[in-house]
Amino acid sequence: MTTKITGLVKWFNPEKGFGFITPKDGSKDVFVHFSAIQSNEFRTLNENQEVEFSAEQGPKGPSAVNVVAL
């Protein structure tokens, strides 16, 4: 079972399609790509938006998957 993590969007660039989430547990910032955002609308995030996600190890560090805005 995958652990769900909550955090706040540190920043997200909709033109480039990626950004970073700061987990509420104080752990290292997590990379997020627009393709990981679960939405039927335009896949973007806003600074300081609260989200829930799972983390996987990506090629350059932790990467968010199954990102849902709260």
From Swiss-Prot:
PANTHER family assigned to the protein according to its UniProt record, in alphabetical order: COLD SHOCK DOMAIN CONTAINING PROTEINS
Location (main, coarse): cytoplasm
Keywords (A to Z) from UniProt: Activator, Cytoplasm, DNA-binding, Transcription, Transcription regulation
Entry superkingdom: Bacteria
Gene Ontology cellular-component terms listed: cytosol
The keyword Manganese is annotated on this UniProt entry: no
Cellular compartment(s): Cytoplasm
Span of domain CSD: 7-67
InterPro entries (alphabetical): Cold_shock_CspA, Cold_shock_domain, CSD, CSD_CS, CSP_DNA-bd, NA-bd_OB-fold
Species assigned in the record: Salmonella typhi
A molecular-function term among this protein's GO annotations: DNA binding
Keyword DNA-binding applies: yes
Xref: PROSITE patterns: CSD_1 (PS00352), CSD_2 (PS51857)
Protein name per the record: Cold shock-like protein CspJ
